[in-house]
Amino acid sequence: MSGTHKKLGARHKARKRAVDFLFEAEARDLDPVALASERSDLSVKDDAVAPVAAYTVTLVSGVAENLDRIDQVISSHLQDWTLERLPAVDRAILRIAVWELFHATDVPPVVAVDEAVELAKQLSTDDSPGFVNGILGQVVLVAPQVRSAAAATSQRAQESDSGTE
C-alpha cells in the first residue's frame, strides 16, 4: 500500500518544480535555466525558498536546450490544435515528458508518461490527463528510434573528441 504513495517521491517533486519553472519562465518571458539557477541560489540564502533538486535543473536545462525539437514533436502529434492554444501548464508537462522520453535513459517510458499524466491531474484541467496521455502515447512510439539516434550521435562525438586529444 505504501508503494502507491512512493511515486510521489523526489523525482515526482523535481518534475513538478520543473513544470513550475517552465510555466513561470514562459509567463514572465524569462530564461527557464536562469530562473532555476536564481531560485537555487536564493534557496541557499533563504530557508523560506525550497531547495532546487538536481533533477529539476536537469529537466529545465534539457527542455531549454532542445525546445525547438521538442515543440516540433509535440506539434506534429496535435490534431486540430496548435501548441500555442494548449494551456501553458500542459505545454510545460508535455515538454518535460518528451525530453524524458528522448533523453532520460534511466527513466522507463511508461514512467515518463505516467508522471506526466499525474502532473496533469494535479495541475491542469479535467480534460488534460487524457489529452497528455494521448499525445505521449503517440510520442512513445518514436522514442526508441530517437534515443538510438541520440546515443549514436553522442558516441561519434566522444570518439571524435578522444581522437583530437
Swiss-Prot record:
The keyword Transcription applies. GO terms for biological process: DNA-templated transcription termination; transcription antitermination. InterPro entries: NusB-like_sf, NusB_fam, NusB_RsmB_TIM44. Belongs to the NusB family. NCBIfam families: nusB. Involved in transcription antitermination. Required for transcription of ribosomal RNA (rRNA) genes. Binds specifically to the boxA antiterminator sequence of the ribosomal RNA (rrn) operons. PANTHER family: ANTITERMINATION NUSB DOMAIN-CONTAINING PROTEIN, N UTILIZATION SUBSTANCE PROTEIN B-RELATED. This is Transcription antitermination protein NusB. It comes from Rhodococcus erythropolis (strain PR4 / NBRC 100887). The gene is nusB.
